[in-house]
UniProtKB/Swiss-Prot annotation:
Keywords: Cell wall biogenesis/degradation, Glycosyltransferase, Golgi apparatus, Membrane, Transferase, Transmembrane, Transmembrane helix. The gene is CSLG3. The chain crosses the membrane at residues 47-67, 72-92, 543-563, 577-597, 617-639, 674-694, 697-717, 731-751. Pfam families: Cellulose_synt. It comes from Arabidopsis thaliana. Its EC number is 2.4.1.-. This is Cellulose synthase-like protein G3.
Amino acid sequence: MYQVSLKQFVFLLKIKSTTMEPHRKHSVGDTTLHTCHPCRRTIPYRIYAVFHTCGIIALMYHHVHSLLTANTTLITSLLLLSDIVLAFMWATTTSLRYKPVRRTEYPEKYAAEPEDFPKLDVFICTADPYKEPPMMVVNTALSVMAYEYPSDKISVYVSDDGGSSLTLFALMEAAKFSKHWLPFCKKNNVQDRSPEVYFSSKLRSRSDEAENIKMMYEDMKSRVEHVVESGKVETAFITCDQFRGVFDLWTDKFTRHDHPTIIQVLQNSENDMDDTKKYIMPNLIYVSREKSKVSSHHFKAGALNTLLRVSGVMTNSPIILTLDCDMYSNDPATPVRALCYLTDPKIKTGLGFVQFPQTFQGISKNDIYACAYKRLFEINMIGFDGLMGPNHVGTGCFFNRRGFYGAPSNLILPEIDELKPNRIVDKPINAQDVLALAHRVAGCIYELNTNWGSKIGFRYGSLVEDYYTGYRLHCEGWRSVFCRPKRAAFCGDSPKSLIDVVSQQKRWAIGLLEVAISRYSPITYGVKSMGLVTGVGYCQYACWAFWSLPLIVYGFLPQLALLYQSSVFPKSSDPWFWLYIVLFLGAYGQDLLDFVLEGGTYGGWWNDQRMWSIRGFSSHLFGFIEFTLKTLNLSTHGFNVTSKANDDEEQSKRYEKEIFEFGPSSSMFLPLTTVAIVNLLAFVWGLYGLFAWGEGLVLELMLASFAVVNCLPIYEAMVLRIDDGKLPKRVCFVAGILTFVLIVSGYVFLK
């Protein structure tokens, strides 16, 4: 029989009550911590892939034959090139359908004495107190500090890359409030351990204790928001004498781009307890690395590497959780779920990280902007999980610290012994020599002539450091696991306007191209390191921006042909006509099936495919252009923080009603508006031609019809709406001019 101590039994009982899993039958003495099963749709998908591949080969034959016999060489070449890109991108998607798997973990069976649990370092990143409100950071920090996990094993590091005294003040307030919040959560087995979420819930406790805690939270929130609104921390608000001096560092010369290192221990598990002296408080450390205008800081990857070094000096926990500041913990048993994999003797040696999906709160009914990223964070993940494992998505990831120091069989030693991944820390985190070394490794020139960013830590060279780092770890031989419990492990906020969505994804497109066009390209280095299927799977993301080419060609060329009654597709009487129909229905049908099988709705899928088109005409296109200009040294790009603050009530109401929010004028809306106008004109003229001239250009008309239905929100924003979220008149006017130019140009090539 498997035996546990009384203390261990009580701790496991708490974990079991937080897992929210349905009852499962296990044999007596069964200590299996997790299981893995292949998806049932694998074989049918492989069979379909064979038939679809045959269809693509036939289509390529048709294109080549047309190219050799047709007079319109340019048009045929564009269609051929577009279909080559579409075929390649379909192949990348199919590689992720090759071996999808589902995993289940059993945290209630994780047996260890509380003192034997491994230490856990949590990294939370923020960069702007106005785009990422400090109270959001506070709630994320408190939610992980309150994990159902030995508190003395948890160390929370908050990286403030904006170097803001407002964020530091908010965390000081959080440290004081945590002494009431953490005991309350653990005594009452609270599931929602983000205070904002808990006190907004209709199911929360109304006891005197709960109401008292709520009053404390509202007082804290009021103080923090007052400080943020005023833009400075007034002396009257600093109630703890030991922290008064740290705010003197914010002098007139202090800027977000040029300032010294600030490391402040706000809570120490060795000394801090709640008022009843029954509960130990976890470590809470504020870190703002040194910045200089003459030194490269490598954006978020640089901030994470600083935390990796600072935590290595202070606590050096073997497990690291990375979180964005808006991604609060939604399940207090999450660390134990990760341990089911990270401590399994069968796989732990080569396991680099356990990735949880990103889940977003407040998503509209049918996810109008496709911000749940269902394919990115769920569908593709189970496909990757059957290969080398899921890619890293920037947050909600438990890392094996050893994974940042070379391949499983090839440890790369850091430049100083204090940063070795297996070192046991034997000094208090607030010891003078420990803090001195922590300040040193957070310096802006510390990484010069070291392996940081190239062979050690998070990797530099791409704006999407999460994708690039996970990819490089897989290339080195590390594996990963996708953990998707029924209760979401983490929840966050998503953009609520189209301009925020496409701006964020333009940055992703640029970063992914930086990987695709590099010495570590997935199609070459990736295939060599991980094998054909996994390497091609990584191309699904690296080549994101390439979607823009076929979308532009198919968004304009057939429609212009329709306006001039010049055929670019086979007519309905031609047998090749049906090949286009079958390939289109097959690709879209399989995409719909993927979506629905993973719990999506039909309306959600429709919006998802529409946003795929919108991205192709905006973020992917402009990302490709900006990357090209940067490669030619004609421009540079930086890292723009996506705003998580949403105080516009009217915008929120429109979002809930699923009305598109275009917002301010942006050049990224020009191609989108132009393609909407061109397709509407082509649809009207093609419909007239169908009745006036008989057979008509059916495929061209069907394509224009499909585009018009997808563009209905754009027509509404152009003509019918008068609210602030409508398309700006300037965009509509310029798009009208571009439409005229395209139609006139079409006469040259199509007549």
